[in-house]
UniProtKB/Swiss-Prot annotation:
Compositional bias of kind Polar residues: 105-126, 158-174
Annotated source species: Dictyostelium discoideum
Annotated ranges, domain SH3: 1-58
Name of the protein this chain belongs to: Probable serine/threonine-protein kinase mkcF
EC number: 2.7.11.1
Residues noted as binding ATP in the record, renumbered to the chain: 407-415, 428
A Pfam family annotated for this UniProt entry: Pkinase
Entry GO MF terms: ATP binding; metal ion binding; protein serine kinase activity; protein serine/threonine kinase activity
Region listing for Disordered, in residue ranges: 72-244
Ranges annotated as biased composition (Basic and acidic residues): 209-224
GO cellular component: cytoplasm
Family: Belongs to the protein kinase superfamily. Ser/Thr protein kinase family. STE20 subfamily.
Length: 677
């Protein structure tokens, strides 16, 4: 008998639905259609959404529509059918689907460790609480380096990543498994060998990480990432060079009351930012907020309780001295600098949790719940998105998906020009193993499935293969608006008008559905040789009605002032980002391109400097409506679409020739490093 645990409250809308509260145990009976599960609770039989149940931290919100397989007999060595001597019963398994087979169709054994005991990479959770073993294989995450120019057949399906398998939160399916005693013995022997290899690899990794931390110690001390082996003097590149900021999340938290309290190495780097210190002092809290967003540095700001306290007396406090810190508690209130309403996750983690693994799992769970709140989605939303994921046998997948060349590479995956069922498509390959990875992918898929508009990328389906997910979408022959802006072509205002109007149509569609994109930028807009303009990348999309409005997300150059300042954000934020895209088309780069910090800082306090914009009066007026600092006075998308500027834009047929000339000569291996969607 298999039991499931409810991860949330659910009230059935009809009599054939079960109702339960978080933490209740539900007896599993069978899986039904549309992501629902049939179970038994307190003697009542009914259905409920799979997104609200879990078993040993493996949520079933991503259950696939795979048939339930029952097997009560096994073949012995002589080939005859005999009853199994294993104690295995009906169980829940985390599949690697058919992808666990190699090219010959045979499964290869692979092991990992769960709760200190050896097991297969696909642990079977039995009804009696014990762990059995099956044989499986983990696919190589570096799929981009193993895909042939002509076909999928050269994909290297190895077991090199078996150590990651224990923590994987992957698409689950139901099956019953029986294992012969001889198989269990063989697997146990293999497990011992694998555990030894795993231990050796872990020790090597720890040594490598320690060395890396020692080598990069100076990197964490400053504001910027330093190239390996470079000195501090060599790191002072020119202002025209795009700088890479250091990730200071693991650095010592700051407690500051003024700019002078910031560490010297950071203040030294700030001299390269071309931001006057006086401006930073006048907008110190805003500066700290931007600094936290860019570097993830933990910061606490001390604010005077009594404004009449002399500034000189406050400045004499040495925050590195224990006595001064104790005195500061009577003079200041402490305010943690945040980029969202739920920044401090540690405050929500139960204090009694002592085990590091349990605490890490709890922290991850809280972070994902926080993200769902801020984007206005639910576990049901993710469960519905997971129903578009397909599990195809490896023998068929190599015939149905054929990769050609890579057309894009981003932070979360690679994009390939491919054939799916003999139809040309784009396939984005992403890791799909950890809870965070799965949550992010399902969130994007969920919003894409809600959209059906000619100016928004059309999502087809997703295919699970090992620990990777292939996100299949329509193929677009062309490139990004960022690539178009950086080309030698100089856009006329009439051409800018066509692109802008098409993009506004996509934004209008989202706003009508009570959604905001929150990451509109030139790299997230595709233009095709057919004269089409499509909005892509819905990873930061959110619901206006259900989501949190105070959350700092997006791309620094395109971020609206209200989002940078920590105010409530809604539809006007997308309008601001749209305006920056228009400026990039006109001037080939967004304002303050040389520094993300400078762009965010001055966009938040000064807005856009209109006198420097040389264009027609109606275009300048349209941009003025986009860049109104007060979001309540900023134009709406419908009002912008009726603006006179867009009445003189070029036609689709005219733009078709422009985009064809722009992208027809580009190499097939030319990629956009900013991502695809």
């Amino acid at each position: 008998m298999l039991y499931l645990v409810a991860t949330g409250d659910y009230k059935g809308p009809s009599e054939n639905h079960l109702s339960f509260t978080k933490g209740q145990r539900i007896e599993f009976l069978e899986r039904t259609e549309n992501g629902f599960i049939k179970g038994k609770l307190d003697g009542k039989v009914g259905i409920f959404p799979s997104s609200l149940i879990t078993i040993e931290t493996r949520p079933l919100s991503i259950i696939q529509n795979q048939p339930i397989k029952y097997s009560t007999e096994t073949k012995d060595d002589t080939g005859s059918i005999s009853s199994s001597t294993s104690t295995s019963t009906s169980s829940l398994t985390t599949p690697r689907a058919e992808s666990s087979k190699d090219a010959s169709g045979e499964q290869q054994p692979s092991t990992s460790t769960i709760n200190g005991q050896s097991s297969s990479t696909s642990p079977i959770l039995q009804s009696n609480g014990t762990t059995n073993t099956t044989t499986s294989s983990t696919s190589n995450n570096n799929i981009g380096d193993n895909i042939s120019e002509k076909s999928f057949g050269d994909y290297d399906d190895t077991t090199s990543n078996h150590s990651k398998s224990a923590s994987r939160l992957s698409v689950a399916s139901f099956s019953t498994t029986t294992t012969a005693t001889t198989t269990t013995t063989t697997t146990t022997t293999a497990t011992s060998s694998k555990d030894k290899d795993k231990k050796d690899k872990k020790e090597k990794k720890e040594k490598k990480d320690k060395k890396s931390k020692d080598d990069d110690k100076s990197e964490k001390e400053g504001l910027y990432r330093k190239s390996k082996g470079s000195s501090s003097s060599s790191s002072s590149s020119s202002s025209s060079t795009k700088r890479r900021y250091a990730n200071r999340k693991a650095c010592e938290p700051w407690v500051v009351k003024k700019y002078e309290d910031i560490p010297e190495e950071v203040k030294s780097d700030m001299l390269k930012e071309d931001i006057p210190i006086k401006d930073i002092q006048d907008h110190f809290k805003l500066f700290l907020r931007i600094l936290k967003f860019i570097t993830r540095q933990k910061i606490t700001l001390l604010i005077p309780i009594d404004p009449t306290i002399p500034t000189k007396e406050m400045n004499l406090l040495d925050l590195s001295d224990a006595e001064s810190v104790a005195k500061s508690t009577t003079m200041f209130t402490r305010e943690e600098i945040r980029t969202s309403a739920f920044d401090n996750v540690d405050a929500f983690v139960d204090a009694p949790i002592m085990d590091d693994n349990e605490k890490a799992a709890k922290t991850t769970e809280i972070k994902l719940e926080r993200k769902r709140i801020l984007t206005g989605i639910s576990t049901e939303f993710l469960g519905q998105a997971s129903t578009t994921i397909r599990v195809i046998p490896s023998s068929d997948i190599k015939k149905r998906i054929k990769f050609t060349h890579m057309v894009g590479r981003g932070q979360y995956g690679k994009v390939y020009d491919a054939l799916y069922d003999k139809k040309r498509v784009c396939v984005k390959v992403v890791n799909y193993s950890t809870p965070k990875e799965q949550h992010n992918v399902l969130q994007e898929i969920g919003f894409l499935t809600q959209c059906d508009h000619p100016n928004i990328l059309k999502y087809n389906c997703s295919v699970l293969y090992g620990s990777d997910l292939f996100i299949v979408s329509e193929f677009i022959q062309g490139g990004t608006l960022e690539q178009a802006s950086a080309s030698s072509h100089v856009f006329k205002e009439t051409q800018v008008g066509f692109i802008g109007l098409e993009l506004l149509k996509a934004i209008s569609y989202l706003h009508e559905k009570k959604l905001i994109h929150r990451d509109i930028k030139a790299a997230n807009v595709m233009v095709s040789t057919d004269g089409e303009v499509k909005l892509i990348d819905f990873g930061l999309c959110a619901s206006v009605e259900k989501g949190g409005s105070q959350h700092m997300v997006g791309s620094p150059y395109y971020m609206s002032p209200e989002m940078i300042r920590g105010e409530e954000c809604s539809y006007p934020s997308d309008i601001w980002s749209f305006g920056i895209c228009i400026l990039e088309l006109l001037f080939k780069k967004p304002p303050h391109r040389d520094s993300r910090m400078k762009a965010m800082f001055y966009n938040a306090i000064n807005g856009i400097d209109f006198p420097k914009i040389r264009c027609s009066i109606d275009l300048k007026d349209m941009l003025w409506q986009c860049f109104e600092s007060n979001p309540e006075k900023r134009s709406t998308v419908d009002k912008l679409m009726r603006h006179p500027f867009f009445k003189r834009c070029e036609s689709k047929s005219q733009m078709k020739s422009v985009f064809t000339d722009m992208f027809s000569t580009s190499s097939k291996n030319s990629i956009s490093t900013t991502g695809f969607f």
